[in-house]
Structures are given as structure tokens and as C-alpha cells.
């Protein structure tokens, strides 16, 4: 008997009221315990698809299943227990502290919205420590650096205990150290047997950390598979309409560079 995918998207279409067809008949499935990169140019439908998966946007047609159950029949509270979200744009914090912000991730489980249990508080404290922001728990979220805010928002999504985490452009505006830190934290999620779907523009970063990559162009799914197999110079040319060199570094990790930046020594080799 075939294993049920953690996430299955069936013939997803999203057409906005102005007639714009953002996602076009998209179908794919993802197993549990995978870090999955979602890449493609601006406007290719990545964010729209993720918003349809968590029902922030209603699909025009198609179905989305988590562990074999359609989210189309789920209430918002039920979906919040299955899917957590780390948005690209930081929403207003309304003066909340780091602790209060992360506690919001527990609200789908509370019997009374404002009555957190000792168990909830312990879970939040443990999560703050896990993500290295425990010392910031009493600080206002809007007083943190971009990297610290990103860790807090990932911690909030983690404490929600979802099956699927959707992360939209988590490394934007971060330096390389924070980018690598964020990706390490996302990989750590996989120990909970959840799947993490990350929309990102840094192709090399996705190729280095992700188990699978989904590539989109103009609302359509172009390819899905192992990064070392699907990320090629031909694909970059077709999807991004630029010339790039795709190769392997001395550690066997993929790099993607514009042609004029490509290294010219034997440390690198084309796959």
C-alpha cells in the first residue's frame, strides 16, 4: 500500500477577480519530513499557491490534502493545527513582546483564547531556548533586528506544532550568516516529521539545504525533484531568462552564478 503524502495539491487554479490567472492547474505531492524549496521569478505564483494551501486565499478550483484529508472541508482552527505560516512581510506586532508573539502559535489549541496553560508556557519557553531567543523574551518584537525577528516568527510557527510549515522568503534582507542560521533552524524542524515548504529567491541556498525543489514559471509548475537533478543551466535560462553557470563546489554543493561571476579554476566542476 502506497504511503499517503503529507501534502497533495491537485489541479490547483487561482484566478483573481481582475482575471489574473496566478496558479494554473498545479499538481504535486510531498512526503513527510522534507525541506522543500519553492523557487521562481517574482510573480510566478509561489506566494499565491502557499496562501491557497493554508486557505488565506480560496482556490478557484482544485483540492489540497494534508495527510489525505482535504483542507477545503476544514475550519480555520483545524487548518491552523495542520499548517503554520511564516510570511515574507512582518505584520504589525502591536507592541507584543517576543514571548507573547510566540505564544500566539499556541492559540489554535487553547480552550479559552486568553487562558494559556502551564504546559503552553513551558512549550513556549523551551521553543525560545531552542531558537536562541530566550534572552529576548521580554523585548518588544519591533525592537529586534531583522534576523532576530525572523527567528521569533519561525519559533511561533514551530510552537504551533503543525504538519506543514509554509515559509515565504525567510532570508530576504539578511546577511549570509543569518541566512545560514535560518536554514539550519528550518532543517531542524524535520526532526518533528513535519514538512517545510520555503519560497525563496536564493537558488544556491535552496539547492544546498533542500531535499526537493519545486520550480515555477508564470503560474505553472515547471519541475520538481532533487535539486542536483532539476537545477540546470537550461532550466535557469528557461525560467529566469538569464545565462548562469551551475556547478558543484569542493563539498559537492550546487552553486548558481551569473556567467561573468562563474569561477574558472578546478575547485569547481559542472555536474
Label for each model-derived stretch:
Residues 7, 22-23:
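Conserved structural motif at the start of ABC-family nucleotide-binding domains
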Residues 39-41:
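The feature captures the beta-strand-to-loop junction immediately N-terminal to the Walker
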Residues 54:
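Helix-to-loop junction immediately C-terminal to a conserved catalytic motif
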Residues 62-70:
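Conserved ABC transporter NBD signature motif
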Residues 114, 140-144:
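Conserved ABC ATPase signature
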Residues 165-168:
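Catalytic Walker B motif of ABC-type/P-loop ATPase nucleotide-binding domains
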Residues 239-271:
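ABC ATPase nucleotide-binding domains
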